Structure formats: C-alpha cells, structure tokens
C-alpha cells in the first residue's frame, strides 16, 4: 500500500481515511496505524493502571503486603503502589474478617472511591467469616459489591495476583465505558 500524498484540503484527507478498510488493516499496521474502538482503548488504560487501596483486617493482610514485594511485584500488572486514601484508588482489597462495627467504615471508604471502582474479597474470613463464624462477623459482600473472591486461609500472593488478572479481564470486557466517562 502506498503512502498517501500530501493533501490539498480536508476533503482529500477524508477520502484517504475512508480508504483504510478492514481488508487493509494488515497493511495499515505496517505503516504504524492502530485501529481500535474508543471503548477498547479506555478499558486498556484502566486495566493497566489499577490503583489498589489495602484494607487489611487480619492475617491475610500480611500476604497482601508480600504481593507488592520484589518477589511477586504487582507493578508488572499495572498496580504500582498501594494507596492509603480511597480518593486516590479504584480498587479496594478487603483482607480479613469484617465485624458489624467495621462494616460502616468499609462502606464509607468504598463510597469515597471515584468511579469506576472495584473490590476484591481476600481470604475465607472476608468471604464467608471463615473459622470465626459468630454473631459479630458478616461477609463483606453484604456490605459492598465484590468483583472477585479469593479463597484461602490465608491465600497465597499468587492467588491474589490471579484475582488481579481476573479483574483486569473483567475490566477489558466492559462495554459502554466511554458513555459512562462522558456521562451520556
């Protein structure tokens, strides 16, 4: 495919753009042209720049902290640094048992997070109150919506990394992203 000549006006520019059909996509890729949808581009950016906020309530928090150490290095998945503020994060990782007194705090922090926001429930205690099944504990999915559940007591860092990858896949497959960004 030849490179387009210099245009003499806007009409010629539109003619050249229209010439790039799906059949010519391979040739266009060789010229450095990328074809995608706006939804796919926004979802790609979101899935590769997740800002997690830790909320460690028990022993699972130790495994969550080791996930960001050099051995596992979640930076390669786009989750650079754990944030301490809900206003700077879009992912909340709840690790440990949730008591009735802690539930309003979790809900309040989740509501402070900007849209879009996601949540991961890490460990048996956060998911189903675990071995401490008594009147004072509740599963975290009764407090906030959970996107990914990570089983285990405590789950290994590899399991949490896999949960992060599952969340990235969920973000990638979302539709209507641009409409929600533009409030349409």
From Swiss-Prot:
Cofactor: binding details: Binds 1 [4Fe-4S] cluster.
Gene Ontology molecular-function annotations: 4 iron, 4 sulfur cluster binding; iron ion binding; NADH dehydrogenase (ubiquinone) activity; NADH:ubiquinone reductase (non-electrogenic) activity; quinone binding
Keywords for this protein: 4Fe-4S, Cell inner membrane, Cell membrane, Iron, Iron-sulfur, Membrane, Metal-binding, NAD, Quinone, Translocase, Transport, Ubiquinone
Catalytic activity: a quinone + NADH + 5 H(+)(in) = a quinol + NAD(+) + 4 H(+)(out)
Pfam family, one: Oxidored_q6
Record-annotated disulphide pairs: none
EC supergroup of this enzyme: translocase
GO cellular component entries: plasma membrane; respiratory chain complex I
Topological category with respect to the lipid bilayer: Peripheral membrane protein
Protein's cellular compartments: Cell inner membrane
Biological processes, Gene Ontology terms: aerobic respiration; electron transport coupled proton transport
EC number: 7.1.1.-
Origin superkingdom: Bacteria
Task of the protein: NDH-1 shuttles electrons from NADH, via FMN and iron-sulfur (Fe-S) centers, to quinones in the respiratory chain. Couples the redox reaction to proton translocation (for every two electrons transferred, four hydrogen ions are translocated across the cytoplasmic membrane), and thus conserves the redox energy in a proton gradient.
Family: Belongs to the complex I 20 kDa subunit family.
Protein name: NADH-quinone oxidoreductase subunit B 2
């Amino acid at each position: 495919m030849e490179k387009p000549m210099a245009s003499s006006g806007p009409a010629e520019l539109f003619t050249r753009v229209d010439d790039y059909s799906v059949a010519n996509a391979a040739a266009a890729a060789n010229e450095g042209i990328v074809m995608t949808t706006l939804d796919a581009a926004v979802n790609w950016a979101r899935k590769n720049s997740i800002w997690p906020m830790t909320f460690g309530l028990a022993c699972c928090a130790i495994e969550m902290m080791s996930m960001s150490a050099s051995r596992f290095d979640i930076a390669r998945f786009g989750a650079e640094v754990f944030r301490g503020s809900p206003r700077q994060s879009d992912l909340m990782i709840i690790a440990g048992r949730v008591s009735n007194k802690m539930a309003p705090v979790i809900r309040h922090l989740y509501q402070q997070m900007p849209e879009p926001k996601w949540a991961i429930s890490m460990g048996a205690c956060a998911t189903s109150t675990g071995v401490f099944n008594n009147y004072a504990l509740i599963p975290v999915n009764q407090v906030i919506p959970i996107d990914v559940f990570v089983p285990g007591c405590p789950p290994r860092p590899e399991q949490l990394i896999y949960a992060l990858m599952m969340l990235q896949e969920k973000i990638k497959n979302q539709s209507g992203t641009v409409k929600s960004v533009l409030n349409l």
